[in-house]
Amino acid sequence: MNLNATIFFQMLVFFVLGWFTMKFVWPPLTKAIDERRQKIADGLAAAEKGKADLAQAQARVSLIEASAKSETHARIIEAEKQAASMIEQARREAEAERARIVAQAAQDAAQEVQRAREALRDDVAALAVKGAEQILKREVDARAHAELLNQLKAQL
């Protein structure tokens, strides 16, 4: 095995190339690889944080949904109670109005009956006077006997 100058020169070039690569090329490559590794790690951490945030958000949404559902249910129950109360109040008011109308109608009927009785008394008194007039064949003075007619009305 001959060791000649070419091999030494190639070895020298190889070591110079190795030193140059280690000194000037390798550090930016390792730096780029480390930065890329760090970006990947940051991305994975952000993804994990995003997953955790998503889980928390879903939990909050579930709580908000449950709260809204219970609140809606409570509002529906309250609205139903209020509607029932309003219906009951309207029913009471309608009953009171009906009672008032019936009482007014009864009062009007009683007044009409009273008026009819008064008119009937007047008619009966007039007929009695005419009958007495015809029986006696003379005219009876109505003014003179007004008190007698009023007593007759009171008795009827």
Swiss-Prot record:
- Please report the record's description of how this protein sits within the membrane: Single-pass membrane protein
Q: Which Pfam families match?
A: ATP-synt_B (PF00430)
Q: Which residues cross the membrane?
A: 7-27
Q: Which UniProt keywords apply?
A: ATP synthesis, Cell inner membrane, Cell membrane, CF(0), Hydrogen ion transport, Ion transport, Membrane, Transmembrane, Transmembrane helix, Transport
Gene Ontology molecular function: any one: proton-transporting ATP synthase activity, rotational mechanism
Q: Name one GO cellular component term.
A: proton-transporting ATP synthase complex
CDD domains (alphabetical):
ATP-synt_Fo_b (cd06503)
Localisation per UniProt entry: Cell inner membrane
Q: Which family does it belong to?
A: Belongs to the ATPase B chain family.
Question: Its biological function?
Answer: F(1)F(0) ATP synthase produces ATP from ADP in the presence of a proton or sodium gradient. F-type ATPases consist of two structural domains, F(1) containing the extramembraneous catalytic core and F(0) containing the membrane proton channel, linked together by a central stalk and a peripheral stalk. During catalysis, ATP synthesis in the catalytic domain of F(1) is coupled via a rotary mechanism of the central stalk subunits to proton translocation. Component of the F(0) channel, it forms part of the peripheral stalk, linking F(1) to F(0).
NCBIfam families in the record: ATP_synt_b, PRK05759.1-2
| Quaternary data | F-type ATPases have 2 components, F(1) - the catalytic core - and F(0) - the membrane proton channel. F(1) has five subunits: alpha(3), beta(3), gamma(1), delta(1), epsilon(1). F(0) has three main subunits: a(1), b(2) and c(10-14). The alpha and beta chains form an alternating ring which encloses part of the gamma chain. F(1) is attached to F(0) by a central stalk formed by the gamma and epsilon chains, while a peripheral stalk is formed by the delta and b chains.
The name this protein goes by in its record: ATP synthase subunit b
* Organism of this sequence: Bordetella pertussis (strain Tohama I / ATCC BAA-589 / NCTC 13251)
Traced from the root, the source organism's taxonomic lineage reads: Bacteria, Pseudomonadati, Pseudomonadota, Betaproteobacteria, Burkholderiales
Q: Which gene encodes it?
A: atpF
